[in-house]
Regions:
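Conserved adenylate-forming
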Residues: 67-69, 190-203, 208-252, 274, ...
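Conserved ATP/PPi-binding loop(s) of AMP-dependent carboxylate-activating enzymes
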Residues: 381-385, 396-431, 468
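ANL superfamily adenylate-forming
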Residues: 6, 134-202, 314
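Conserved AMP-binding/adenylation subdomain of ANL enzymes
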Residues: 229-249, 259-298, 313
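AMP-binding/adenylate-forming catalytic core of the ANL superfamily
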Residues: 125, 300, 414, 419-420, ...
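Gly/Ser/Thr-rich phosphate-binding loop
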Residues: 147, 294-302, 315-374, 387
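Conserved AMP-binding/adenylate-forming core of the ANL superfamily
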Residues: 18-20, 37-82, 86-90, 107-112
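Conserved beta-loop-beta connector loops within the AMP-binding
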Residues: 389-411, 447-448, 510-514, 549
Length: 562
């Protein structure tokens, strides 16, 4: 029984099967054949066509092969959103290798762990992170490092100004060590090699993405070439009443080392034969907004913290930026407040939908409909060819009936799930059982097939035998007019096992006391759910896509108690 199928937007396909036996390389090259000068990427005023992307990635693939990179080898990509990331990734794929996408902002400890986790022997790195990679190289299997400068694909004048004014200050002026080779030198060398001849199958491994770090050191989730094509088709199909082939400009500010962008935005852009506009730093809110204005971006995948930051920025409050080109937004990573949704939709005359995915799902799982009913607090319904059931937490072979009283673990069946964690069969077996992905998220499904997340299985707070869902408390706190951001977790308590604690960032110019917050919560929550402790902060620790790291707050609290 799949009640969600009856609530899809009109005209959307209920299934996309059978999926074509293709790779994203094939998809890209179909556009090269049909419209070679269609723009594939825009970066700071530079446009790169599908044909040019094909040529550059061929050149890089040839260079990798000549360096000894073999089919199945892992090549680490340690870069933000710059054209070299996309060129290198397609080049890695054409060489038959696996792209291991690593957050360049990792600490040296985290970076060494990621490199060792995937076993990469080659790393492509932006110059300002070169020293970091070199510092940990001896702790890893990395044999060769390929540096690339952020300025390489800037327009001529901007490149000159960057060289004169910013290159040294930003840490991008480097001397490379013996044995390492510049990215552009490899492009020149490989450009004389023609079309790579390595045979790449849809079932070959294409991608390693690292889990988000909300539960400790990251694990390496593996996706195939077919995974990416399926994900791209699912996303494009869900939005096909708005997105049109060849026409749309995907604002890509979310980092390409993250599942949202790499297994979601990028495949959907190529499947739709659209354009990706790259923004290297999603935290640079003025740059994000000015890029939307200049490039007339139409599709804006984002996260709640970015929507909030834009709404309160002077460029918006003083009407100094035009965001009217946006016709569709998708929000992920954390819950989107209804107030934020309504204000941003009013600002842009666009529609915001919410999506739900995990690194392990390799993107598309659930999404709210574009035209159908919006249900506050819901992550939407399964997209085409995805099935979701709510499993009993005591016996996960049993599925729970519909309704808010039947909370269980969200379990997914889908054709695009990860193959597993790289060389971690035990961890894989915990997540993947008989072809189903056990998410660790608790929630319920209503009779229309809409799914509601209650909380993470591991984050439930136990107060005197009662269960408290942090998200429920956070949703109440977020309604307080003085609260900008908040997070809730359980801290040890000798009397009640755990106590509820809230960490709060106040809106600029607003004030509140712990007593104010507690009184507000008592009006809406049962007594044991009201935060016993309230801490005001200037900011909350977040992941690279703006997800609040509850674990870090709990860790800080534990350190205070010792």
């Amino acid at each position: 029984m799949k009640p969600w199928l009856h609530n899809y937007d009109e005209g959307l396909p209920r299934t996309l099967q059978p999926y074509p036996s293709k790779t994203l390389i094939d998809v890209m090259q179909e556009t090269v054949k049909d419209r070679p000068y269609q723009t594939a990427m825009i970066y700071k005023g530079t446009s790169i066509s599908y044909n040019r992307l094909d040529e550059l990635s061929n050149a890089f693939a040839n260079a990798l092969i000549s360096m000894g990179v073999k089919k199945g080898d892992r090549v680490a990509l340690v870069m933000p959103n710059i054209p070299q990331f996309v060129i290198a990734e397609f080049g890695v794929w054409k060489a038959g290798a696996i792209a291991a996408c690593i957050n360049p902002l990792y600490t040296e400890y985290e970076l060494a762990h990621a490199l060792n986790e995937c076993g990469a022997e080659t790393a492509v790195v932006m110059t300002r992170f070169y020293d970091k990679v070199k510092n940990v190289q001896k702790q890893t299997k990395v044999k060769r490092v390929i540096p690339t400068n952020v300025k390489e694909y800037l327009p001529a004048l901007m490149r000159i100004l960057f060289t004169l004014l910013k290159e040294k200050k930003e840490g991008d002026r480097i001397e490379i060590q013996e044995g390492d080779v510049w990215f552009q030198d490899l492009i020149k060398k490989g450009g004389m090699g023609g079309i790579p001849t390595v045979e790449v199958s849809p079932d070959d491994r294409a991608l390693i993405l690292f889990t988000g770090g909300t539960t400790g050191l990251s694990k390496a989730a593996v996706g195939t070439h077919h995974t990416l094509v399926i994900s791209g088709m699912q996303i494009y199909a869900w939005f096909s009443n708005i997105l049109k082939e060849y026409e749309d400009n995907f604002l890509t500010a979310l980092p390409l080392f993250h599942v949202f962008a790499n297994a979601g935005i990028q495949p959907a852009a190529f499947v739709s034969r659209g354009t990706m506009t790259l923004v290297p730093n999603a935290r640079d809110i003025p740059d994000v907004m000015k890029t939307i204005e200049k490039t007339k971006a139409t599709f804006f995948p984002s996260v709640p913290t970015m929507f909030n930051a834009m709404l309160v920025h002077p460029l918006v409050t003083e009407s100094k930026v035009d965001l009217s080109s946006i016709k569709l937004c998708i929000s992920g990573a954390s819950a989107l407040l209804q107030d934020t949704k309504e204000r941003f939709e009013a600002l842009t005359s666009s529609r915001i939908v919410e999506g739900y995915a995990l690194t392990e799902s390799m993107m598309a799982i659930c999404c709210t409909p574009v035209e159908g009913a919006y249900k506050v607090g819901s992550i939407g319904m399964p997209v085409a060819d995805v099935s979701v059931r709510i499993a009993d937490v005591e016996d996960d072979s049993k599925s729970l009936p519909f309704g808010a009283d039947n909370i269980g673990e969200i379990v997914i069946s889908a054709p695009q799930l990860m193959e597993g964690y790289w060389q971690r069969p035990d961890a894989t077996a915990e997540m993947l059982k008989a072809g189903e992905l056990f998410t660790g998220d608790l929630g319920y499904m209503d009779e229309d097939g809409y799914i509601f997340i209650v909380d993470r299985k591991k984050d439930v707070i136990k107060v005197s035998g009662f269960q408290v869902w942090p998200r429920e408390v956070e949703e109440v706190l977020a309604q307080h007019p003085a609260v900008l951001e908040c997070s809730v977790a359980g801290i040890p308590d000798p009397k009640t096992t755990e106590a509820v604690k809230a960490w709060i960032v106040l809106n600029e110019g607003q004030s509140a006391t712990a007593e104010d917050i507690q009184a507000f919560c008592r009006e809406k929550l049962t007594g044991y759910k009201v935060p016993r402790f309230v801490e005001f902060r200037s900011s909350l620790p977040k992941s690279t896509v703006g997800k609040v790291l509850r674990r870090e707050l709990v860790k800080e609290e534990a350190e205070k108690q010792t």
